[in-house]
Amino acid sequence: MSQEMTLQERMDGEGGSDPLRQAVKGAVAALAQAAIDISDLTCRGALAGITGQAQGRNTDGDVQKDLDVRADQIIRDALGKQPIAALASEEMEELDILNPGAPICVAFDPLDGSSNINTNMSVGTIFSIMPTPSDVNAAFRQAGSEQLAAGFVVYGPQTSLVLTLGQGVDIFTLDRVDRVFKLTGSAVKIPAEATEFAINASNRRHWDLPVRAYIDECLAGADGAGGKNYNMRWIGSLVAEAFRILIRGGIFLYPGDARDGYEEGRLRLVYEAHPMAFIVEQAGGGASTGRKRVLDLVPGSLHQRVPLIMGSIKNVQRLEHLHTVPDGALEANAPLFGNRGLFRV
């Protein structure tokens, strides 16, 4: 495998001339070009007029930044030239039907983590490609296991594109000289187990008992049930967290909790959880709500939210197991500060 293989060459190597396969290739190529244009904007920041200032709220109630709007338009313009039946975006209230007879539909989050723009942290784009069903209005009411392709782009120190076509995961890095994505990682595999976890620990008091028990195990380190010392990570950018997990393993948790509006988490199933779950499973990891496999979920609405726990398969399975333990048992076994220390002798 050549380190200089381009994304286009990799896609050409997939073979197949049927309309479905060709449409997927065209959509991926268009998304990659859009990502290059968005990368140019993020790199220039304030020099390109990117201030990170709020521009109101999107249809789902989240604060909308100026770059959210521009990234959304860049992607819509790129995909509008492809044989696509319908588009769905975080920034759009309803499905945008383009060509009902086309073979594929594309959902995307144009700029994940946009709250990080002002602090110069990584942001990204996430996308999911689905086959067009007989009723195009039901395009994104399909189980995640129906996805034809999924990917995400991280606009960080490098601009990286992570892609699965359902046969493993590849990573491409933007060559800024040639302005093309080049293959830098093939058949990526997530370690089966790792000692890093990512969660916003400030919300601990709102979590349900299984999540609290799992994090308590991690914090107990070698003295706890896991018998290992863990490190915590939290970037607040889904794409950055996912990329780290692909490279080093570990587990990411954005659970539902007891706060109003957070009962089902905050991540969207169609254009965040589904594509991430597809990628993570293709890399040998797991993706779950804690109780259900994410790829088995069928969206009830375009902007449905869902808890997301993903990463190294053994870590995810441990948390799933804790969801089967009665709450009384979890409370009885809750660690305080480990086997030894100020509060335990």
UniProtKB/Swiss-Prot annotation:
Organism: Nitrobacter winogradskyi (strain ATCC 25391 / DSM 10237 / CIP 104748 / NCIMB 11846 / Nb-255)
Residues holding Mg(2+) 2: D109, D112, E272
Cofactor binding note from Swiss-Prot or TrEMBL: Binds 2 magnesium ions per subunit.
CC terms in the record's Gene Ontology section: cytosol
Gene Ontology MF terms in the entry: fructose 1,6-bisphosphate 1-phosphatase activity; magnesium ion binding
Gene3D superfamilies reported in the protein's UniProt record: 3.40.190.80, Fructose-1,6-Bisphosphatase, subunit A, domain 1
Pfam family, one: FBPase
Protein family according to the UniProt entry: Belongs to the FBPase class 1 family.
Pathway(s) it belongs to: Carbohydrate biosynthesis; gluconeogenesis
Location in the cell: Cytoplasm
Name of the protein described by the UniProt record: Fructose-1,6-bisphosphatase class 1
Cofactor: Mg(2+)
Key word Hydrolase present: yes
Catalysed reactions, as listed in the record: beta-D-fructose 1,6-bisphosphate + H2O = beta-D-fructose 6-phosphate + phosphate
Main enzyme class: hydrolase
Alphabetized UniProt keyword annotations: Carbohydrate metabolism, Cytoplasm, Hydrolase, Magnesium, Metal-binding
Quaternary context: Homotetramer.
Residues bound to Mg(2+) 1: E90, D109, L111
Binding site for substrate: D112, G113, S114, S115, N200
EC number: 3.1.3.11
